[in-house]
Amino acid sequence: MYQIFVTKHDTAIQTSRFSVTGSITPVAPTGNIPVINTGNITAEHAVVSLYANLTAGTSSDGSFIVAMKVDTSPADPNCVISAGVNLSFAGTSYPIVGIVRFESASDQPTSIAGSQIEHYPIEMSVGSGGVCSARDCVTVDIHPRAFGNNVFVGVICSSAKWTSGRVLGTIATTQVIREYQVLQPLK
C-alpha cells in the first residue's frame, strides 16, 4: 500500500516527430530551446513553481526546458531521474512532456540546441483546459561525454500548437543516488 513502483526505464529517442494519438501534435524541437530557471539550477534536485508569460518568440518550436545540474560523483554512470509535472497552459496548447539530458560548458545555461538533447519519453495525462500532468522515472547516463562539460537533466514541454499565454504549475526533478527498499506492513 505504501510502495510505488517505477513504471519504465526508457532509452533516449532522437526522432523528428514523437508518436502520439489524438489531437496532440508534438514536434521535436530544432532551434535553440530556452532553459527556464528561477534562480540557480542546483545539483540533485529541483522544484520550480512556474508563473511565466511565454510567447511564441520565447520558445523554439513551442518548447522550453526546466533543468538541473546532475551530481556526477557516483561511480555508476547510470542514475535514476524522477520527475513530476503538473502544468496549466492558457489557450489550447497541449504539450508533450518528457525528460531530457544535455551537456553544457556553462554552469547556468540559458538555452540549448534541440539537436544536442536526448529525449526520454514519460507517461503523461492531459485534461481539459490545457492541463497536463506526468510522473515517471528514467535511467540516464550522468557522466559527461566531453571533458569539462556539465551534465543537466530536466523536463521539456513541447507543442506544435503553441499559443502565447501564461504557464502555471510545478515541475519537480530528483536524482536518485541511493535506492531504498520500502517495507510493506505485515498482514
Swiss-Prot record:
Localization annotation: Virion
Cellular component per GO, a single term: viral capsid
Keywords annotated in UniProt: Capsid protein, Host-virus interaction, Viral attachment to host cell, Viral genome ejection through host cell envelope, Viral penetration into host cytoplasm, Virion, Virus entry into host cell
Record SUPFAM superfamilies: ssDNA viruses (SSF88645)
Effect of A75S: In phi KhT mutant
InterPro entries: Capsid/spike_ssDNA_virus (IPR016184), Spike_G (IPR003515), Viral_coat (IPR029053)
Gene Ontology biological process terms, A to Z: symbiont entry into host cell; symbiont-mediated perturbation of host process; virion attachment to host cell
Annotated TM spans: none
Family from the record: Belongs to the microvirus G protein family.
Subunit note: The virion is composed of 60 copies each of the F, G, and J proteins, and 12 copies of the H protein. There are 12 spikes which are each composed of 5 G and one H proteins.
Further facts: Phi KhT, a host-range mutant of phi K, can grow on E.coli C and B, besides K12, and is more thermosensitive than the parental phage phi K.
Function per UniProt: Attaches the circulating virion to the bacterial lipopolysaccharides which serve as receptor for the virus. Determines the phage host-range. Probably triggers with protein H the injection of the phage DNA into the host cytoplasm upon conformational changes induced by the interaction with host lipopolysaccharides.
Identification of the protein by name: Major spike protein G
Species annotation: Enterobacteria phage phiK
